[in-house]
Amino acid sequence: MKEELDAFHQIFTTTKEAIERFMAMLTPVIENAEDDHERLYYHHIYEEEEQRLSRLDVLIPLIEKFQDETDEGLFSPSNNAFNRLLQELNLEKFGLHNFIEHVDLALFSFTDEERQTLLKELRKDAYEGYQYVKEKLAEINARFDHDYADPHAHHDEHRDHLADMPSAGSSHEEVQPVAHKKKGFTVGSLIQ
């Protein structure tokens, strides 16, 4: 578990820096938006990433606490602090997924070389981190909770929809439709 924690710490520290760079890029776009739609669109993305920063401010010290821990018995589902760490890690796996999508959206809008270069670098690092976190958390969750089912697993069921990086020149017509698996009953689906 120590090896995974070291990697998680590196990934989320790097992610925090990436979010700050991304937000710094968005700030002048929001301030100089041509219309309300553009301002609200990027402000919404900015606020979501701002919320992630506050979650990372909680997660990173929690990882550090367990990195320094010598009592292996504390790495157990019976330890509430360890359970919280696992919950925060699973939440941030989804946060990484969202960050990649935000960067992908920005890649469509910002076609200048400087921002394209920055965004592609941020995306590459975030995607690699996401893949590692996704894989390791699946292993950790299987190790500690045999009944665990990732509620977001449908995102990656048949193919990782984040794998194909969009380009600034892509058109909406080039996007292949995603086949959705028919879902069963849901809360409220039987209410008439």
From Swiss-Prot:
GO molecular function: ferroxidase activity; iron ion sequestering activity
Role of this protein: Cargo protein of a type 1 encapsulin nanocompartment. A ferritin-like iron-binding protein probably involved in iron mineralization in the encapsulin nanocompartment. Has ferroxidase activity even when encapsulated, the rate is probably controlled by the rate of Fe flux across the nanocompartment pores. Part of the iron-mineralizing encapsulin-associated Firmicute (IMEF) system. 2 different cargo proteins have been identified (IMEF and Fer); when both are expressed in E.coli with the shell protein only IMEF is detected within the nanocompartment.
Region (Targeting peptide): 180-192
Biotechnology: The encapsulin and cargo pair can be overexpressed in E.coli and in human HEK293T cells. In HEK293T in the presence of 0.5 M ferrous ammonium sulfate nanocompartments can be detected and used as cell markers. Can also be targeted to cell membranes by addition of a farnesylation signal to its C-terminus. Coexpression of this nanocompartment with a smaller nanocompartment from M.xanthus (AC Q1D6H4) allows of expression of different sized iron-rich particles. The encapsulin shell proteins are not seen to mix.
Enzyme kind, highest EC tier: oxidoreductase
Region annotated Linker, chain positions: 143-179
A GO biological process held by the record: intracellular iron ion homeostasis
Binding residues for Fe(3+): H44, E48, H102
Comment, domains: The C-terminus (targeting peptide) is probably responsible for targeting to the encapsulin nanocompartment; it is separated from the rest of the protein by a flexible 37-residue linker.
GO CC terms: encapsulin nanocompartment
Keyword Transmembrane helix: no
Temperature dependence: The empty encapsulin nanocompartment is stable until 86.6 degrees Celsius, when loaded with cargo protein is stable until 88.9 degrees Celsius and when grown in high-iron conditions is stable until 91.8 degrees Celsius.
Tree of life domain: Bacteria
Basic and acidic residues compositional bias, start-end: 149-163
Keywords of this entry: Encapsulin nanocompartment, Iron, Iron storage, Oxidoreductase
UniProt EC number: 1.16.3.1
Ranges where the record places region Disordered: 149-192
Reaction(s) catalysed (UniProt annotation): 4 Fe(2+) + O2 + 4 H(+) = 4 Fe(3+) + 2 H2O
Cellular compartment(s): Encapsulin nanocompartment
Record flagged with keyword Oxidoreductase: yes
Subunit structure: Homodimer, with 2 Fe atoms bound at the subunit interface (without encapsulin), probably also a dimer when encapsulated. 42 electron-dense accretions can be seen inside the nanocompartment which are probably this cargo protein, although perhaps up to one cargo dimer can be bound per shell protein.
Pfam families: IMEF_Flp
Name assigned to this protein: Ferritin-like protein
